[in-house]
């Protein structure tokens, strides 16, 4: 449940002027307005991990606000089976919108789709209802070689297009990206999961993530039995996954309402994975390519 200083679950990813939201708990709109950097009209995709109220109850009001922001482009929603039925039931108070809603219902253990230049992988986790985690990957091509472009006598007007992966043909000559680009470099990766016990798929998709956002429902060791019973994750378990997956940084989130001071447990958590942070509402970061690569 929400607390006066802690709203319910939602994450917004911004890329190239477009936004994807994952989950939309009660109070999401308020947090967005307080944060001040996110535009409602720019939300193109809303993904849901599962259909418990703390992850979806903020949707009706958000849809009305997106409509009031004069969005007319279709909005994509992604989530487990029955997504369209669940959303339709919530739209009783938001029946008329100036944009269409498209649905992608997940049914497989692992599925993927494209958004902008990113690949989005959805993977099933282990909760007491069907629940998915999401991993977003932005690939990065190899370095452009001016010397190779000149050796292959490629007209300069094609250089920019080749860097973007395009192929060109002129006077019987075909120019392809591999003629001027080195090996692919490490891209950017963000992985998000919540409401789950530890599973091999979480480690698989978190592997190499620049940022791993993971549930840390409980920190007290005496709550471990409760975590297993209700299929949630201990902070220490999340840290172990982060260490095994060799992530750049981990943000813990989705705390139990009984946990008023998550920071109390961070010394123990960091003894397992040093680059762990107890996340707070409206935290932001910018993921950047490593220019040395």
Where are these regions (language model features)?
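Conserved beta-strand hairpin/beta-sheet module of binuclear metal-dependent hydrolase folds
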Residues: 1-38, 74, 134-136, 182-193, ...
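Active-site-proximal loop/helix segment associated with metal-binding centers of metalloenzymes
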Residues: 3-5, 116-192, 196-205, 211-213
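Short, surface-exposed connector motifs at secondary-structure boundaries
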Residues: 16, 69-74, 244-251
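Active-site neighborhood of phospho(di)ester-bond hydrolases with catalytic His/Asp-centered motifs
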Residues: 22-25, 43-52, 80, 191-196, ...
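Active-site metal-binding motif and surrounding structural segment of the metallo-beta-lactamase
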Residues: 27-78, 102-107
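Metal-dependent catalytic neighborhoods of phosphoester/phosphodiester hydrolases
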Residues: 58-65, 87-90, 260-268
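A gly/proline- and charged-residue-enriched helix-loop-helix capping module
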Residues: 85-94, 103-108
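Binuclear metal-ion centers of metallo-dependent hydrolases, dominated by the metallo-beta-lactamase
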Residues: 109-110, 199-293
């Amino acid at each position: 449940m929400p607390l006066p200083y802690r709203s319910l679950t939602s994450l917004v990813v911004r890329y190239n002027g477009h936004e994807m939201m994952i989950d939309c708990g009660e109070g999401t709109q308020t947090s967005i307005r307080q944060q001040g950097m996110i535009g409602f009209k720019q939300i193109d995709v809303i993904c849901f991990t599962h259909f418990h109220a703390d992850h979806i109850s903020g949707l009706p009001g958000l849809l009305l606000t997106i409509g009031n922001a004069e969005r007319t482009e279709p909005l994509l929603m992604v989530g487990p089976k029955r997504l369209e039925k669940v959303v339709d039931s919530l739209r009783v108070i938001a029946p008329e919108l100036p944009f269409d809603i498209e649905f992608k219902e997940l049914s497989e253990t692992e599925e993927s789709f494209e958004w902008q230049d990113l690949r989005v992988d959805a993977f099933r986790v282990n909760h007491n209802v069907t629940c998915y985690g999401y991993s977003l990957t932005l690939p990065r091509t190899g370095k452009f070689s001016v010397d190779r472009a000149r050796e292959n006598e490629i007209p300069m007007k094609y250089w920019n297009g080749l860097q973007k992966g395009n192929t060109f043909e002129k006077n019987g000559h075909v120019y392809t990206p591999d003629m001027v680009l080195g090996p692919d470099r490490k891209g950017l990766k963000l992985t998000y999961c919540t409401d789950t016990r530890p599973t091999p798929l979480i480690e698989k998709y978190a592997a190499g993530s620049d940022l791993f956002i993971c549930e840390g429902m409980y920190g007290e060791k005496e709550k471990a039995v409760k975590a297993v019973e209700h299929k949630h994750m201990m902070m220490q378990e999340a840290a172990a996954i982060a260490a095994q997956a060799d992530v750049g940084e981990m943000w813990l989130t989705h705390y139990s309402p009984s946990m008023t001071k998550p920071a109390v447990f961070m010394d123990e958590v960091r003894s397992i994975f040093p680059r762990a942070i107890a996340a707070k509402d409206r935290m932001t970061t910018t993921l950047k390519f490593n220019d040395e690569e």
